[in-house]
Amino acid sequence: MPLEPVSLDDKYDLRKSRIFVTGFQALVRLSLMQKERDRQAGLNTACYVTGYRGSPLGTLDQQFTRAGAVLAKNDIKFHPATNEELAATALSGSQQAELRGEGRFDGVFGMWYGKGPGVDRSGDAFRHANFSGTSRHGGVLALMGDDHTAESSTTAHQSEFHFVDVMIPILNPAGVQEIIDYGLYGWAMSRFTGAWTALKCMHETVESTAVVDGSLDRVKIVIPDDFAMPPGGLNIRLGDSVLGQEARLHDFKRDAMLAFVRVNRLNRVICTGGPAPKIGVITVGKSYLDVRQALDELGLDEVRCNDFGLRLYKIGCPWPISRQDLTDFAAGLDLVIVVEEKRSLIEVQVREELYGTANQPVCIGKKDEKGNWLFPVKGALDPNDIAICIGERLLGYVRNDDLAARVARLKEAQRALAETQDVAARVPYFCSGCPHNSSTVVPEGSRAYAGIGCHYMAQWMDRSTLGFTQMGGEGANWIGEAPFSKRPHVFQNLGDGTYNHSGSLAVRAAIHAGVNITYKILFNDAVAMTGGQHVDGNITVVQIANEMAAEGATRVVVVTDEPWKYPTGTKWPAGLKIHHRDDLQEVQ
């Protein structure tokens, strides 16, 4: 049998259905698929993609840039933003393109991307955008790049609760295939409900590679026919009142979300539990894959799950979840186990919706039946721990020597793992030749604050550097500390990317507060930590120097390996001096 011909171009060739892609590439293909599906439906739409680069969505912008030629042919505009909340605001504008009769297309569907801190800082923009709504043939997907174990962030992030707070429904894919599937459902739901749709993009998902079905007709969107639209519909409108937007969101849009999720079966039973189900497992996204691995470790396929009375429910939309879906799932069960990483989003809805129902089952998740930690909020979940939890409770209903032996082996393996010492720990360091390697050194007796970027690593080195803030807050902490400290002065490291993103406001605030602080703006013209991309806007050393002088900085100097590279006549601010990097300590 001859091998199927494969090309690197297949991933964006919509004539090919079976494709080999990463999660990032799947998101690029997703935009192409939506455009073509609209075309086949008789719509002339465009797409607007914007956001701020950052891991775990760290190379998404590169994938969109590389696909620029094919995207341009399909009216898909990729436009990196200065920061996340401005990207969200721009996407809100994309939904207004047809409102005044000035639109060039039938609609613009949008995609926002950012990591957890970007979701944090965009809350107000999300709230305003979701209140005003989406266009009928537009819709917006918000990709939240969550980092549950803080592998590339200053904090461990779980962004779902931010979207719940602004009432944006959430889809949580388990694998690359569902990135495409849920993306298409997400845009359709956004159009139907008039609300944005969030798509959770953990690095375990988007950084995976898989062979997927990229057929244009794979996903069959069903529009609910039992939902009564209010007068004027749910989409964005001109002259809308604030209280009218609020009322529509609470009175109609949430119900529209539930109707869409239910009719499209985004939450579905995987194993019924056979004729006499006793235990039900509810899970979502990456945790669903962990549960499937746990069941494999226990030797439980669908047949044995049904034999043992184990029902499995896969959630695609963790918020909102309908009462009817949960009561249907829980019917006849004695125990419900909710498996989800970080804080409990699904478990609290299960408890709320099942409370007071007939034959209400016991519900465990974060804590067990006795109130002890079961699946802790911190860190990530381990499939072996999930397997032990499920296996032990199944053994309370069935006697099976093989299952008991498997649970015992897993317990022993976890005990051995807990006793294993980490003997190969290595502290990250700057790349060879990186200017940060010398720029972050401070004079003896001085101290510095770190910030967001590679120079965060200076805290792990012998550089008297300790402490950091959120992105864009660098140095503002000294405004509050300085009046109460014996120390007269500190240094603050600030990357050029962060300066452009929002850090310039912190410098302005420090100047206005009159505190004694030296900002070391570490310029290397690259977002080195997330792919080496150029800083958006192509800012220059000359531009930054003039901005700092205009803000009122007492003294501005430039330290460089190549003082001679700036030609005579360069428009520096008055009094600026240029020094060689060898003189850094003297300058400081």
Tell me the role of every PLM-derived stretch.
Residues T59-T65, A90-G93, R121-A125, A150-S159, ...:
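Short acidic, glycine/serine/threonine-rich loops at helix termini
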Residues T134, G145, Q459-R463, A476, ...:
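Catalytic or ion-translocation cores adjacent to nucleophile or general acid/base/metal-coordination motifs
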Residues D146-W196, M202, A228-S241, P488, ...:
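Conserved thiamine diphosphate
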